[in-house]
Amino acid sequence: MFKKLFRQDGNILNSELAEDLPIPRHVAIIMDGNGRWAKKRFLPRIAGHKEGMDVVKRVTRYANAIGIDVLTLYAFSTENWKRPTDEVDFLMKLPVEFFDSFVPELIEENVRVNVMGYRENLPEHTMRAVEKAIADTAHCTGLTLNFALNYGGRSEIITAAKEAMKELVSEGKTSEDLTEELLNDHLMSHGLGDPDLLIRTSGELRLSNFMLWQLAYSEFYFTETHWPDFSKEDFLQAIIEYQNRSRRFGGL
């Protein structure tokens, strides 16, 4: 089933993209609007999260189909613990259901799972599901499906700076020896590369403490569409918009 859909999506998506223009290597998405989607339909917020999980599967398929290397999804921030307990409990159960149902298909399509964030603070059942998904797909060499789970950009930078300084001190060096490259080596996203394109759904125009270091030169794409309604056409439009931009990285 997954292979059939994968091939269909690949044919449709690739036929719409400019062959002579690059696609983003790394796409990051702030998946926003689950609660508002549910409210519009007089449903509980968790219904929006449930629907959003299905969209994650579809968008993963789209990204894989067009040859994106890394797809990073902002799943749960360090600030999200402030939400109502019943909502947080549901969100912590979602990875278990998601990975149980989707990992076999990911393996079939050579997709590797990665999770960045403060995993040690996750509930035990969530941690087990995460670690199993990572282990089960460790041999895969295609798309990296990277989840930011219990993640905060500011905390990540502080943690990376502390680890970098420990390394320098152990080598008899000082803060004067700290470089961007060394700090980058200690970020949770090390080895994945910086996002080329950031997509945020639901019309909000902010980063919400997401990958603050890594997004320095990323292209941003904002859409009014709530995450549960985010379609193949929405994804394709974001990629086409990226293809039509000129990235200068501070130059001319």
UniProtKB/Swiss-Prot annotation:
It comes from the Bacteria. Its cofactor is Mg(2+). GO terms for molecular function: ditrans,polycis-undecaprenyl-diphosphate synthase [(2E,6E)-farnesyl-diphosphate specific] activity; magnesium ion binding; manganese ion binding. One of its GO terms (biological process) is polyprenol biosynthetic process. Homodimer. PROSITE patterns: UPP_SYNTHASE. The keyword Magnesium applies. The active site is at 32, 80 (proton acceptor). One of its GO terms (cellular component) is cytosol. This is Isoprenyl transferase. Its EC number is 2.5.1.-. Belongs to the UPP synthase family. The keyword Transmembrane does not apply. Keywords: Magnesium, Metal-binding, Transferase.
